[in-house]
Amino acid sequence: MNLYIIIFHLANDADRRNNLVSLIKQQGSWARITDNVWCIKAENKTTAEIRDVLGPGIQIQKDERLMVVDITKSAWASYYLPKEVADWLKG
């Protein structure tokens, strides 16, 4: 199981943001870190494959940002992360 972090910045469009969040949740088990930073656990997917589902799925614009990073073997530390999110990341 791989762990990915998804970071995005969209124009102020609640419908498109909700669509992106829905697409993120469809990629695998997920946790919301902040409003614009999510983590997913998924098998048999690459960062490019995830990006290519999310970006076109919301018709991302040139002035917006979307980044997918594989953090499977990365160390992490945090302050004030909700316990359920920290537990999810550890699990």
Task: Explain the meaning of each model-derived region.
Residues 1-18:
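Short S/T/G/P-rich N-terminal loop/turn motif that feeds into the first structured element of a domain
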Residues 5, 80-81:
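Compositionally biased, intrinsically disordered low-complexity regions enriched in proline and serine
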Residues 8-12, 24, 44:
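Generic secondary-structure microfeatures
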Residues 15-31:
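Short aromatic-glycine-(Arg/Gly/Cys) micro-motifs in beta-strand/loop hairpins
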Residues 26-80:
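Short, intrinsically disordered low-complexity segments
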